Amino acid sequence: MKNNQPADAISFIVDVLKKEQVIAYPTEAVFGVGCDPDSETAVKRLLELKQRPMEKGLILIAANFDQLKPYIDDAALTAEQREAVFARWPGPVTFVFPAKPSTPRWLTGRFDSLAVRVTNHPQVIALCEAFGKPLVSTSANLSGLEPCRTAQEVLAQFGDDFPVLHGATGGRQNPSEIRDALTGELFRQG
């Protein structure tokens, strides 16, 4: 891509995603790298790029809750648990839901659950809406390096040809908080 954003950046990035490639995009705090969650090829590319074991599981980021329903067992939550989740969404809080049995292991890793987030970042909302589904979302950084906070940092770490949706992060200093949707237990402070 040579660091020049095409006129229709979202369409360009969606085309890259449809080719089972990994992309970078701004999130609430840092840039993320992501791909099509339904493509084992794309997810394996992302895991290889990040040097991340599949067993750890991944996060999905979505424009709305409906995009997450194919992957999570929403029926496992009580009305009160669902209300607690929706009180924090959209926003920078990731919740771990029970996964549907059909959710691929390349997303859940060794778990029977899946971490998911409904974002309030306008570019990520537009991207997920244009793509028609959520994205895998993990911080944009190579193993041992700090997460990227700008498109320029992404290109410096991943190379000038890496497909990046240019834009600003949401300005948060910390990555998303992670909580259990069933118990409310805090796994990672945001």
Curated annotation (Swiss-Prot):
It is found in: Cytoplasm. This is Threonylcarbamoyl-AMP synthase. It is an enzyme of class 2 (transferase). The gene is tsaC. The keyword ATP-binding applies. Belongs to the SUA5 family. TsaC subfamily. It comes from the Bacteria. Keywords: ATP-binding, Cytoplasm, Nucleotide-binding, Nucleotidyltransferase, Transferase, tRNA processing.
